[in-house]
């Protein structure tokens, strides 16, 4: 349910189908998979999510890269504090998961992961509106 809230595409491509595809890829290529996990404060930073992610990581024998959420205008989600990120990372590590936290750059200028896309879309929409107004 949390995954569907964060990623509406989960309705079209459920997690189980994604995991099966990852397993097929691993068998075919014999390569390690990295799972990217975005941490959103008070949404998916609890112990229930730790346990679910441990199960997924052990099933895939993958590495997990934690990505603290970058605030995006128009969304109410919040970035977790450093202590929450560290606690989540440590909980995974103590359960045998190979885990890293993404080093980020650009958050302070709205240029980090997720932020640039919104800016690009807003700029394109504004340009389209400007052209429509000129042509009217």
Label the model's feature ranges.
Residues 94, 104-136:
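Radical SAM enzyme core and accessory elements
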Residues 66, 101-103:
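A structural preference for short, hydrophobic beta-strand core positions in alpha/beta folds
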Residues 1-95:
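Conserved AdoMet/S-adenosylmethionine-binding subsite of the radical SAM
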């Amino acid at each position: 349910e949390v995954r569907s809230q964060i990623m509406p595409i989960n309705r079209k491509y459920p997690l189980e189908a994604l995991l099966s595809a990852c397993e097929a890829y691993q068998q075919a290529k014999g390569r390690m998979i990295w799972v990217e996990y975005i941490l959103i404060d008070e949404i998916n930073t609890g112990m229930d999510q730790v346990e679910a992610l441990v199960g997924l990581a052990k099933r895939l024998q993958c590495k997990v890269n934690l990505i603290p959420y970058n605030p995006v205008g128009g969304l109410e989600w919040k970035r977790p504090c450093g202590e929450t990120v560290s606690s989540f990372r440590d909980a995974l590590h103590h359960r045998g998961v190979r885990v890293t936290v993404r080093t980020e750059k650009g958050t302070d200028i709205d240029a980090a992961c997720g932020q640039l896309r919104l800016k690009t879309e807003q700029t394109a929409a504004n340009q389209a509106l400007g052209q429509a107004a000129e042509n009217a």
